[in-house]
Amino acid sequence: MAHVCSVILVRRSFDIHHEQQKISLHNESILLLDKNLADDFAFCSLDTRRLDIEELTVCHYLQNIRQLPRNLGLHSKDRLLINQSPPIQLVTAIFDSFNDPRVNSPILSKMLYLSCLSMFSHKKELIPLLFNSISTVSGKVERLISFDIAKRWYLRDIAERMYTSESLIKKKLQDENTCFSKILLASRMSMARRLLELRQIPLHTIAEKCGYSSTSYFINTFRQYYGVTPHQFSQHSPGTFS
C-alpha cells in the first residue's frame, strides 16, 4: 500500500518556503506532511530523515479517536505540521529501529508508526490532515462513522461534516462500487465483532454501542451478515468467521 504522509526528522537547521511564507526548521524538530508536499520538497538526505506512513496506519490511528472533532472537513488546507521540541531520543530510536533487521514484527512497526503520529496529537490540525490524506470517499465515510458508531447516522450527517452535498457523495461512492448503507453496516458489524471477541460485554450493551436500540434486531442483522448468531460467534476463537 502506498504511503499518504511522511514524518521528517530535521538533522540541521534550515529554512523552507511554504505557501509564500518562510518557515525556519530547527535541528531535532519533526514535521508531518501529506504525500504530495513531502515529495515536492525533496529534502536533502544530509539534512533530514524521512519515515513514510501508509494509509492503513492512518486509518488505524483515526479509528482510536472517539471524539468527533469540529474541524474535519475537506475545506481544511493544512498540509504541514511542525513539532519543534519532540522527545528527540525517542524519535531517533524510532527512526533507527526501521533500519534494524531485528525489528521485523508488523505489530511493532505499526506501533512505532502510530507513536510518530501521536507526537503531533497536540495539534488541532492533525485530524483534518490525516482525514484528508485518505484516498477514497468510502474510506473517509468509514472513518467518520468510526468516530461514533452508536450514532444514528444519515447521509446528510456525512455530507455536512465533509462540506459537500449528499448527491456528490452518492455519486462518488457509486464510482467506488459501494454505498452509504453498506459502509454503515460493515462498520457496525466490525465493531460488533471486536466487542464480542472481548467476551465480557452484555449483548444488549454491544447492540447499543453498535447503534441498535433493539437487541433482537441486532441479533438478526448480525446473523444475516456473518451467518451465525452473536452467541455462536462468541463461542469460537477470534478470526474464525470472515
UniProtKB/Swiss-Prot annotation:
Gene Ontology CC, one term: cytosol
Domain of life: Bacteria
Record's keyword annotation contains Ribonucleoprotein: no
Residue ranges the UniProt entry marks as DNA-binding: 156-177, 203-226
Keyword hit for Repressor: yes
Domain HTH araC/xylS-type intervals: 139-236
Induction: Expression can be repressed by GadX, depending on the conditions.
Any matching Pfam family: HTH_18
Record keywords: Activator, DNA-binding, Repressor, Transcription, Transcription regulation
A GO MF label: DNA-binding transcription factor activity
InterPro entries: Homeodomain-like_sf, HTH_AraC, HTH_AraC-typ_CS, Tscrpt_reg_AraC-type_HTH
Main function: Depending on the conditions (growth phase and medium), acts as a positive or negative regulator of gadA and gadBC. Repression occurs directly or via the repression of the expression of gadX. Activation occurs directly by the binding of GadW to the gadA and gadBC promoters.
Quaternary context: Homodimer.
The name this protein goes by in its record: HTH-type transcriptional regulator GadW
